[in-house]
């Protein structure tokens, strides 16, 4: 029989072959010899080889090996070679044509588990390394603390013993006792059929990564850029993180790049990358703790063109859970190379926590009891040498750094406001006092961002910060004037009404400015979805019988301008999903022209509004305009439709605008 003879003619094998080790599946090479049954079934017998075993001392095994895994290996490193050279054929065959393949492409399309962060500082006895998740079970935490305390006591008595050796040894034993889940052949086959191991061709993937760092990363700098690019080039970057990056960047690449990746439009591309990242997450088969945290945070800022159970709230909760498990809040207090990255990560989570609660007070503050940390400064960005990566990375500008710092300050301001309005006895005087820093904050932004007189790239970060502030001021003032927090002070409601209208005017001006300068496609998702919130506010004013005819007519004009802005970004998945609902409401109430005669009438109304001052007695109204909302759509006026939850709770047949992220 062939199998026994093959086994007898080969040396004794005591470990799995390289493809099976990479895919983390059971290998029968020790029984049948090489090639093993798994490689034969996958039709890749030539790849079935054994990795060279390296001799190492006990000290290197226990201390140096875990540390080296946290570093990015160089091109000659032994960690990278098996993953680069032993690519499973069934995966590489599904990527790009072999004539276009190179070592970088092969390594990118392999299954990677490397970390993109360097963290080789000595361990603290009081805090775990930030890249290492704490044990899930209480008894393991107690045992680990005991080992650390014993190690510290022995070190005080004898200086020749290292502090981190016992800790690393114990941690490695914990991982040995609690091995990660292994994927079987069925799981691997399912993931392969879903094409989760595939990435776009390298030239298009480079465009995607560049778009991410140009348009997404500046507003949430949760990656170490140079470390990420190095691991991406070496092929050790986590595929979960890469798919998350691609999902976010798909909104900003050109149509030619989308076609080169095999996608007809942005919605299809984003949904595909999002689905692949979700599969990696669900199967627990990719990524170190830091990469999983970063990928979850990126997915938490994505809105698909269809409802999903894994909405932004899910990924935000998942991000907070992972950050707490990793001890990121403690890593912010460390004095080493990783501190800057972890401080930025924690502040981004902190900002989202406040904004989510501010939008919808039914949401719970997840980080309300977290210990305070120092505010961000411009020193919390790494000093980078990007000369060799100049084709992908651009220098970080002053405006980009100030943008995140300003967002943190804005979150603190609105956090203080919410602590007052949600208290048992809120007073108008206290609310006025807490909102005063907002005006000074806005005035200081141009000088801090070093903006030029003409419209430049730095203006994008200024306008995005202002947009966020006016958006949340609209939310607060709208709720105050509607009596959301049981406040009967008539003067406070009048004050809230004035600030609400001023904020609406500023948002209209900002939207028109980005349209004129043709930069609306460069702005982040938070700005894009603010436009839909602004449109909802204009619709509310146009249909509100309590408003004067002047306000209602001005709102109708603003509806046309806002719809024009949305039309420029209608290929964005979030807008593609929202437009049908708006068009139904606008069409039923004749707020949006559906014929050439309607368009001419709207243009005439806009021209008169620019030539003369309108008053309540001289208002042009569209013919047969119905100023009341039909009974079946009354829910439109009663919901909170400018929050974060709109597209993930919205049902087309209900037209219930409950918020938008």
From Swiss-Prot:
Q: What does this protein do?
A: Efflux pump involved in export of biosynthesis of fusaric acid, a mycotoxin with low to moderate toxicity to animals and humans, but with high phytotoxic properties. Constitutes a self-protecting mechanism of the fungus against critical levels of FSA within the cell.
Which PROSITE patterns does the UniProt entry name for this protein?
ZN2_CY6_FUNGAL_1, ZN2_CY6_FUNGAL_2
The record's DNA-binding region positions are 17-48
Predominant localisation class: nucleus
MF terms in GO: DNA binding; DNA-binding transcription factor activity, RNA polymerase II-specific; zinc ion binding
Entry-linked SUPFAM superfamilies: Zn2/Cys6 DNA-binding domain
Native species of this protein? Fusarium oxysporum f. sp. lycopersici (strain 4287 / CBS 123668 / FGSC 9935 / NRRL 34936)
Alphabetized, the UniProt keywords read:
DNA-binding, Metal-binding, Nucleus, Transcription, Transcription regulation, Zinc
* Subcellular compartments: Nucleus
Name the domain of life.
Eukaryota
Task: Quote the protein name from its UniProt record.
Answer: Fusaric acid cluster transcription factor FUB12
């Amino acid at each position: 029989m062939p199998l026994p003879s093959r086994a007898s003619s080969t040396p004794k094998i005591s470990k799995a072959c390289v493809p099976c080790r990479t895919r983390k599946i059971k290998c029968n090479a020790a029984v049948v010899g090489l090639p093993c049954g798994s490689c034969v079934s996958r039709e890749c017998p030539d790849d079935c080889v054994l990795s060279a075993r390296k001799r190492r001392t006990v000290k290197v095994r226990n201390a140096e090996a875990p540390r080296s895994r946290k570093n990015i290996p160089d091109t000659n490193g032994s960690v990278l070679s098996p993953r680069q050279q032993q690519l499973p054929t069934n995966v590489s065959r599904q990527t790009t044509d072999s004539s276009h393949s190179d070592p970088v492409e092969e390594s990118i399309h392999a299954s990677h588990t490397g970390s993109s962060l360097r963290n080789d500082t000595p361990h603290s006895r009081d805090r775990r390394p930030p890249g290492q998740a704490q044990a899930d079970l209480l008894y393991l935490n107690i045992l680990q603390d005991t080992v650390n305390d014993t190690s510290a006591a022995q070190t005080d008595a004898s200086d020749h013993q290292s502090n981190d050796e016992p800790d690393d040894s114990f941690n490695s034993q914990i991982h040995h006792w609690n091995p990660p889940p292994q994927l079987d052949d069925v799981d691997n086959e399912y993931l392969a059929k879903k094409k989760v191991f595939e990435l776009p061709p390298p030239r298009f993937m480079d465009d995607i990564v560049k778009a991410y760092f140009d348009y997404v990363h500046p507003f949430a700098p949760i990656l170490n850029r140079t470390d990420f690019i190095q691991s991406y080039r070496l092929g050790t970057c986590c595929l979960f993180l890469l798919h998350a990056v691609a999902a976010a960047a798909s909104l900003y690449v050109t149509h030619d790049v989308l076609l080169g990746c095999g996608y007809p439009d942005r919605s299809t591309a984003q949904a595909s990358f999002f689905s692949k990242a979700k599969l990696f997450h669900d199967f627990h088969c990719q990524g170190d703790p830091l990469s999983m945290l970063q990928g979850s945070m990126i997915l938490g800022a994505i809105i698909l063109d269809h409802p999903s159970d894994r909405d932004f709230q899910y990924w935000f909760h998942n991000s907070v859970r992972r950050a707490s498990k990793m001890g990121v809040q403690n890593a912010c207090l460390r004095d080493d190379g990783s501190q800057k990255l972890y401080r930025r990560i924690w502040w981004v989570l902190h900002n989202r926590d406040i904004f989510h609660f501010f939008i919808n007070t039914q949401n719970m503050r997840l980080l309300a009891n977290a210990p305070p940390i120092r505010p961000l400064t411009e020193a919390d960005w790494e000093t980078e040498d990007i000369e060799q990566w100049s084709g992908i990375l651009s220098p970080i500008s002053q405006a980009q750094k100030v943008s995140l710092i300003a967002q943190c300050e804005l979150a603190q301001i609105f956090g203080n406001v919410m602590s007052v309005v949600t208290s048992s006895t809120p007073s108008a005087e206290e609310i006025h006092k807490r909102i005063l820093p907002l005006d000074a904050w806005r005035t200081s932004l141009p000088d801090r961002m070093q903006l030029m007189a003409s419209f430049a790239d730095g203006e994008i970060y200024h306008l995005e910060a202002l947009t966020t502030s006016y958006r949340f001021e609209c939310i607060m003032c709208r709720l105050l004037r509607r009596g959301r927090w049981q406040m009967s002070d008539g003067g406070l409601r009048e004050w809230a009404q004035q600030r609400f209208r001023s904020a609406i005017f500023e948002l209209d001006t900002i939207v028109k400015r980005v349209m004129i300068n043709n930069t609306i496609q460069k702005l982040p998702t938070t700005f894009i979805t603010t436009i839909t919130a602004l449109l909802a506010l204009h619709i509310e004013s146009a249909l509100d019988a309590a408003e004067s005819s002047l306000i209602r007519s001005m709102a109708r004009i603003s509806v046309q301008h806002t719809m024009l802005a949305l039309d420029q970004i209608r290929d964005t998945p979030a807008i593609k999903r929202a437009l049908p609902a708006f068009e139904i409401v606008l069409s039923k109430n004749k707020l949006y022209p559906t014929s050439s005669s309607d368009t001419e009438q709207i243009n005439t109304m806009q021209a008169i509004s620019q030539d003369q001052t309108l008053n309540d007695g001289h208002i042009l109204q569209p013919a047969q305009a119905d100023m009341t909302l039909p009974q079946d759509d009354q829910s439109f006026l009663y919901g909170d439709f400018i929050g974060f939850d709109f597209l993930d709770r919205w049902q087309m047949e209900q037209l219930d605008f409950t918020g938008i992220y």
